[in-house]
A protein has these predicted regions:
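P-loop NTPase motor domains
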Residues: 1-211, 215
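Conserved ATP-driven motor cores of ASCE-family P-loop NTPases powering translocation/secretion/packaging/pilus
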Residues: 208-237
Length: 238
């Protein structure tokens, strides 16, 4: 992602709605919305609390409403929705009281700066993030896909890893249960993505995968130089 080396992967082409299996599971759907909103705000340098930040709550409601109606959003559409949201209230509070238009314009400008940045052009190029295509060729043959994020900034890495794990989770939900190994997800240098105390956007989908993946034939291998950096809830599922 964000590089011309190897096979390019698009990060920002579009935020497509999740599969039916995720849409029908309230917990998974809420988690996907939260992770996407947190990752995008992280790219903007906004450390947003999912329960208290008005930026996070506004963006989450925009994504949730669009995805629930089956619509995907690109960054341009998100900017438009921030400026003129397709709803009048956030919770029970009037939109203009909760997040005045002038303040929303500041957020829209920040997202637009991300869209206009030279790096964004690289993120928009390449194939869409499709786990099925990463695991198998168009002829159906298994393959190994190695994704390099060493060239990305910390915020960009977190954003991409969160998107990738959510896509793996969606792909997993489409599979039938099996006791055989169907696929393997290996992640090196897990430090910072699954910490014992903090809750970065990548932690939620990773914990869900560690709890449920084996039932769908998905194996997970995490590598770190210091196991104490991993949340014990994940280690208990090994």
């Amino acid at each position: 992602p964000g590089s011309t080396a190897g096979m390019e992967l698009s990060l920002l082409r579009s935020f497509e709605p999740p599969d039916a299996a995720v849409l029908e599971d309230a917990e998974l759907f809420a988690g996907k919305v939260e992770g996407t909103a947190s990752g995008l705000l992280g790219l903007l340098g906004i450390a947003a609390d999912a329960l208290r930040s008005r930026e996070h709550l506004l963006l989450s409601q925009i994504l949730s409403q669009a995805w629930a109606s089956g619509k995907g959003l690109d960054l341009a559409a998100i900017i438009g929705a921030i400026q003129e949201p397709p709803f009048e209230k956030v919770g029970v509070i009037e939109l203009e009281t909760f997040y005045p238009k002038k303040d929303r314009s500041d957020l829209a400008v920040a997202v637009n700066a991300l869209l206009a940045s030279p790096a964004a052009a690289g993120w928009a190029r390449g194939e869409a993030l499709d786990v099925a295509r990463l695991l198998r060729t168009t002829e159906g043959k298994p393959r190994v896909s190695i994704i390099s994020i060493a060239h990305l900034s910390d915020a960009q890495r977190m954003f991409f890893v969160t998107l990738l794990l959510d896509e793996v989770l969606s792909w997993m939900r489409r599979q039938s249960g099996t006791s055989s190994l169907r696929a393997l997800l290996y992640m090196d240098e897990i430090f910072g993505y699954f910490p014992p105390t903090a809750a970065p956007p990548s932690k939620r989908p990773m914990l869900t995968l560690l709890k449920q993946a084996r039932a769908f034939g998905l194996g997970i291998v995490l590598a770190t130089q210091n196991p104490i950096d991993l949340d014990y809830k994940g280690l208990s599922n090994c």
